Amino acid sequence: MGKYFGTDGVRGEANVELTPELAFKLGRFGGYVLSQHETDVPRVFVARDTRISGQMLEAALIAGLLSVGIHVYKLGVLATPGVAHLVKTEKASAGVMISASHNPAQDNGIKFFAGDGFKLDDALEAEIEALLDAEEDTLPRPSAQGLGDVVEYPEGLRKYQQFLVSTGTDLDGMKVALDTANGAAATSARQIFVDLGADLTVMAEKPDGLNINEGVGSTHPEKLQELVKETGSQIGLAFDGDSDRLIAVDENGVLVDGDRIMYIVGKYLADRGLLAKNTIVTTVMSNLGFHKALDREGIEKAVTAVGDRYVVEEMRKEGYNVGGEQSGHVILMDYNTTGDGQLTAVQLTKIMKETGKKLSELAAEVTIYPQKLVNIRVENSMKDKAMEVPAIAAIIEKMEAEMAGNGRILVRPSGTEPLLRVMAEAPTDAEVDYYVDTIADVVRAEIGS
């Protein structure tokens, strides 16, 4: 991560941290860096989610792009994975998404995609950051025919919808409930499932600029759980603000998280010989029950640090085609280059239809172990050295010995705060409490601040 770019682009409170001035510079300097790697005049797709600050940042960003001769195609409100898909299939130079994903409305972000549909690599982000930190803007200032222009491109939305529909199957007779989080999926999800023939109920589909993710969506699925039960739906599908995540709800109103979704999709592909290298890529936060279910099926797993960026890196490096996170980022590399909530939803309903199984039946193959996570404030200088403290290392070893393989402990530092995260999984809540509390007490005594 750099000074401005985190693991998912540049983020901050809109008009306070992520200002129009910064958006202009990101457009100008980002556009210039991209143009240095192009032989033709660059063509960049720009989209946003439904936040009230989106249009302000979009205008500033586009002005910056135009100032260095970039041709801009405005996609309007579109899901983040829609930008990635269109950049790759329409052979654009790059794409930019204005969104803060599952964050509240006051936040926003700017994320770049390269021409291959993947997020910019660290080297290109470093070039942009160097220009942002330069004392003077010495970039060329073209005029007249050297400036870029803007093309409204609303057909991009329909092309993305048609692509998603093409990956699915006829859902005639299936009752589906959608929660579009008052976000980007509000422009696309309904039509996708109408085209597939589902019997639909849709909630959180009226964005007003301020209600994105507010008590709805993948991070707040409680209302969808009730809606599924009230309507007798066979599945509920909850997206986040930019629709790169999916959390599902079974016909009984029970949540089906990213771990279970990855398992369902991965097993479906493995049974048909279509799971690349018979492996699913996941992070250290995936539940022990997920790991045990994969072991039972003979499916391999590759484990990365937390963050879909690291999952994608591992998938690209090794040629895997399924990966994701417990939070609902699921990457299906046969179809798209990034997590895509609506794509995952289409695949999940297809699997239900083709197997003839209820979602509860498919999900029941993964027994989710109770999990507890405690954040402990520690001295910042010690958070990366906790495992070097003899008492901490000893208590973790003791707890793991007591688990005897029927549980899991993960102790890791926060990437952004002076915190040590202590997580445990075990067959019962009482056991989880015991393991986490015992370790946490020792951590506080040894390095707590």
Curated annotation (Swiss-Prot):
It catalyses: alpha-D-glucosamine 1-phosphate = D-glucosamine 6-phosphate. The keyword Isomerase applies. Pfam families: PGM_PMM_I, PGM_PMM_II, PGM_PMM_III, PGM_PMM_IV. GO terms for biological process: carbohydrate metabolic process; peptidoglycan biosynthetic process; UDP-N-acetylglucosamine biosynthetic process. The modification Phosphoserine is found at S101. InterPro entries: A-D-PHexomutase_a/b/a-I, A-D-PHexomutase_a/b/a-I/II/III, A-D-PHexomutase_a/b/a-II, A-D-PHexomutase_a/b/a-III, A-D-PHexomutase_C, A-D-PHexomutase_C_sf, A-D-PHexomutase_CS, Alpha-D-phosphohexomutase_SF. It comes from the Bacteria. The active site is at S101 (phosphoserine intermediate). Mg(2+) binds at S101, D240, D242, D244. Coiled coil: none annotated. GO terms for molecular function: magnesium ion binding; phosphoglucosamine mutase activity; phosphomannomutase activity. Binds 1 Mg(2+) ion per subunit. Its EC number is 5.4.2.10. Gene3D superfamilies: Alpha-D-Glucose-1,6-Bisphosphate, subunit A, domain 3 (3.40.120.10), Alpha-D-phosphohexomutase, C-terminal domain (3.30.310.50). Catalyzes the conversion of glucosamine-6-phosphate to glucosamine-1-phosphate. Belongs to the phosphohexose mutase family. This is Phosphoglucosamine mutase. It comes from Streptococcus suis (strain 05ZYH33).
